[in-house]
Amino acid sequence: MSLTSIPSLREQQHPLIRQLADCIEEVWHQHLDLSPYHLPAELGYVEGRLEGEKLTIENRCYQTPQFRKMHLELAKVGNMLDILHCVMFPRPEYDLPMFGCDLVGGRGQISAAIADLSPVHLDRTLPESYNSALTSLNTLNFSQPRELPEWGNIFSDFCIFVRPSSPEEEAMFLGRVREFLQVHCQGAIAASPVSAEQKQQILAGQHNYCSKQQQNDKTRRVLEKAFGVDWAENYMTTVLFDLPE
């Protein structure tokens, strides 16, 4: 079965979300040795109501020798809101950054597009191989850059956070995410396990990343309205940003 023949919420979403979801899975399958990562059955596909509109969430998760969890989430609220959320959680035995990407759109327009390879080093530095690969990428100029949230100090200097204002800018964003993913997959394949001491430092960095992401009030408010406070807390801490052991 080809990837594109699997029914998916993306077919009903903004074209950039569909293209990005396809791109992410294509690069993963091309470079990495994937196996399923099993979420609790009731959290793989979720339906609820938000302000009278149907809310649908579809989760796909994989794992590899280098990544404990690779999560692609698609969400749709009626015709008002389309969301893509993706994070690759490295195993702490490897010195790898956190790939994260989000698209938020509604009524035919993408309002927010963010992608980054975020450092887990507490001094906010990326591994040198990543630094050199990312520095060599072309500089992109978007007409509507956006400001990072207050908790956004977890992101790298290579982070893109924009409102794409044209099909050309959407294509630029898609191309840059593909480049980030290719750099990341190649970095992961080349990585060797680290010392026990380094593993503890990486764990601390991953904890910092996840705890900062859990502060995202917008995501939490949407989930609380649709499913209640307890469900939202459980989803934020077990599906979206679970902390490594």
UniProtKB/Swiss-Prot annotation:
The keyword Glycosyltransferase does not apply. Its EC number is 1.3.7.5. It catalyses: (2R,3Z)-phycocyanobilin + 4 oxidized [2Fe-2S]-[ferredoxin] = biliverdin IXalpha + 4 reduced [2Fe-2S]-[ferredoxin] + 4 H(+). One of its GO terms (molecular function) is phycocyanobilin:ferredoxin oxidoreductase activity. Gene3D superfamilies: 3.40.1500.20. Pfam families: Fe_bilin_red. It comes from the Bacteria. InterPro entries: Ferredoxin-dep_bilin_Rdtase, Ferredoxin_bilin_OxRdtase. HAMAP family: Ferredoxin_bilin_red (MF_00618). Catalyzes the four-electron reduction of biliverdin IX-alpha (2-electron reduction at both the A and D rings); the reaction proceeds via an isolatable 2-electron intermediate, 181,182-dihydrobiliverdin. Upon overexpression in E.coli with PCB:ferredoxin oxidoreductase, CpeS and either CpcB or PecB permits synthesis of phycocyanin-coupled CpcB or PecB. Belongs to the HY2 family. This is Phycocyanobilin:ferredoxin oxidoreductase.
